[in-house]
Amino acid sequence: MILRRLVLSATSNSNPRRSQSLSSSGVRILSSSSSDRYTSSSQRYSGDDRLARLRHKDWLAPNEVLKIFDNVKDPSFLLPAYQHYSKRKDYQPTESLYALMINKFGQAKMYDEIEEVMRTIKLEKRCRFSEEFFYNLMRIYGNLAGRINRAIEILFGMPDFGCWPSSKSFNFILNLLVSAKLFDEIHKIFVSAPKLGVEIDACCLNILIKGLCESGNLEAALQLLDEFPQQKSRPNVMTFSPLIRGFCNKGKFEEAFKLLERMEKERIEPDTITFNILISGLRKKGRVEEGIDLLERMKVKGCEPNPGTYQEVLYGLLDKKRNLEAKEMMSQMISWGMRPSFLSYKKMVLGLCETKSVVEMDWVLRQMVNHGFVPKTLMWWKVVQCVVSKNNDDSQANLDRITAC
């Protein structure tokens, strides 16, 4: 299949040093030091009033047990409490109880305890689990613990618990690999989709395109656009944005605008982010007028510019020393409730110093202070030099007015 060939050929050229070893390993058994901690927790647990009901003989329904465990503030008490609960006649573990314990352990970064819970679950096999349970577990290992290899093991271990992953869990792992720039591993996971019973969807293809773009394989990413009909999916704005960004970063604006035209032909409306990518790319290459035209074009299309859009145009005007136009743009932004950046204020002040535009500089400095920015010493020195060098009768008056800010 073209899709697999593209991903394989593209990822095989990425830097192997970026790749992380993802060997499969069994569930970790608690070490002796962890056992000592467990024993100590058991001793302290016995005196916790919040868990007193577990020591009573009254019958406890699963929702009552859940409330008891939810009230536990010290997560080190959870495993001793669970062990005590497992010896009761009304012992009936649920997914909600396991999820609650795992979440508390995750927040406390007690990953060995999570492994102990998973070992217990696998041995007992007393309840069924939803995909959401494993998705949350992968999120904890992938996002909180930074253990991507363990998150992958959870994905492939789901069928052992009678639960098959959907594209949601599968795509989460792919996105995790892209975010970590582990491009070599993407193909290994992708080709396992049939084994896991996962159908490739638009989101999956979007993640692959994003990964290929970030690894510099724009041509392979571009060819993936042809795979959408094969997978009975339709590309969306999230498909095109990484491609447009990639071509803009390489200065290939002709290809970027061709993609914009393709979006319009396929009736995919570009959003503010798409236009911002193009405007920013044009600005960085000094093509300010084209950026301004694009700003007007997006307004005509009914796409509302955001502060980032105007900020990019403002940067472009300042880079070209078009200070009066930049001041007008800044004035409009402020009147619309937007806050220009400190860098734009700094560039504006220094630019006005060069042209000795004292009146305009006075206005900019006041707006800058109103927005909570404090001009640095060097900036004040430039301002003073500018005012004094005017060498006219108004110099002292201008200096007094500006320093009164």
From Swiss-Prot:
**Where do the record's region annotations for Disordered lie?**
13-44
Q: Tell me which domain of life the UniProt entry assigns to the organism this sequence originates from.
A: Eukaryota
Compartments (UniProt record): Mitochondrion
- Example of a GO cellular component annotation carried by this entry: mitochondrion
Which key words are in the record? Answer: Mitochondrion, Repeat, Transit peptide
Q: Which PROSITE patterns match?
A: PPR (PS51375)
Describe where the PPR repeats fall, as residue ranges on this chain: 94-124, 130-165, 166-200, 201-235, 236-270, 271-305, 306-340, 341-375
Residue span of the annotated presequence: 1-37
Q: Which InterPro entries match?
A: Pentatricopeptide_rpt (IPR002885), PPR_P_subfamily (IPR050872), TPR-like_helical_dom_sf (IPR011990)
Q: Which family does it belong to?
A: Belongs to the PPR family. P subfamily.
NCBIfam families hit by this protein: PPR
Q: What is this protein called?
A: Pentatricopeptide repeat-containing protein At3g14580, mitochondrial
